[in-house]
Amino acid sequence: MSSLPFVSDTFAADRWRQMDVDLTDMTFHRLISRGEVDGAPAGEDLPVTRIAFDRPSLRNAFRPHTVDELYRCLDIARCSPDVAAVILTANGPSPKDSGYSFCSGGDQRIRGAAGYQYETTQSSSDDDLATSARRERIEKGRLGRLHILEVQRL
């Protein structure tokens, strides 16, 4: 059972170490060894990370900020030579109805006529500024030729 609020009952918190990343819409953990059972000293990092959507009250619906955080977590895992596997999951259940959901899709509350918009009430962080800077550097003529995976990196 999980001792963390809004985290699945299948999540054993004592087996995971929270990564030192400032997140609001996601959680990011690293699997730790139990000792001889795992073939490594107890408490040592194992080559597995867990990235989870953490908006259970909205059935883990994503918004642009969520996508930015997901990309940041995946990029950290990609750049870590000792990570062999990434588990992508979601936290829950919903406090409203105790239902579980991986991700219900985009949060329609913030979808404008031109698509999904960043919330204006969100405070700007260095990561948000870096994301904005990357968007501005893209040549406008190339936007129509980007692969979906490249778009998600923006």
Where are the regions a protein language model picked out?
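A generic local structural motif
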Residues: 72-75, 149-153
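Conserved CoA-thioester-binding segment of acyl-CoA-metabolizing enzymes
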Residues: 2-98
